[in-house]
């Protein structure tokens, strides 16, 4: 089953961290990603650019409203993700707990809901 591991962290805190800490974190993420690839669970993963360059889009009454910045002002921001394929939620949680981001922020584990399961007529 596929799971999305969402990585939340405090952007301001990460930006203020010493350069050496950033280098160490990058190395830790590189090792983590390689471990996922070697285990055959890695499908995709990327870091996201800072929320200050994000755009929020809403459509109401046929009108598109575009707002600079993220949807919500929170202490932790979505900073990256991994898409993995593992047997069950326990395995996904195990991989999330090993992510370097789990030690500095919050990991959210979301099962992927294949469209064929909830809209079979549209995927035939």
Language model features with spans:
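Conserved, structured core segments of small domains
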Residues: 1-124
């Amino acid at each position: 089953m596929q799971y999305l591991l969402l990585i939340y962290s405090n952007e301001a805190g990460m930006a203020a961290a010493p350069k050496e800490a950033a280098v160490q974190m990058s190395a830790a993420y590189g090792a983590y990603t390689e471990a996922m690839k070697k285990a055959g669970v890695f499908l995709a993963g990327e870091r996201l650019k800072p929320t200050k360059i994000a755009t929020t889009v809403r459509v109401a009454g046929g009108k598109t409203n575009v707002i600079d910045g993220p949807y919500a002002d929170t202490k932790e921001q979505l900073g990256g993700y991994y898409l993995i394929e593992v047997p069950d939620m326990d395995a996904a949680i195990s991989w999330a707990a090993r992510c370097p981001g789990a030690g500095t922020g919050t990991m959210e584990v979301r099962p992927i809901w294949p469209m064929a399961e909830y809209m079979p007529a549209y995927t035939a």
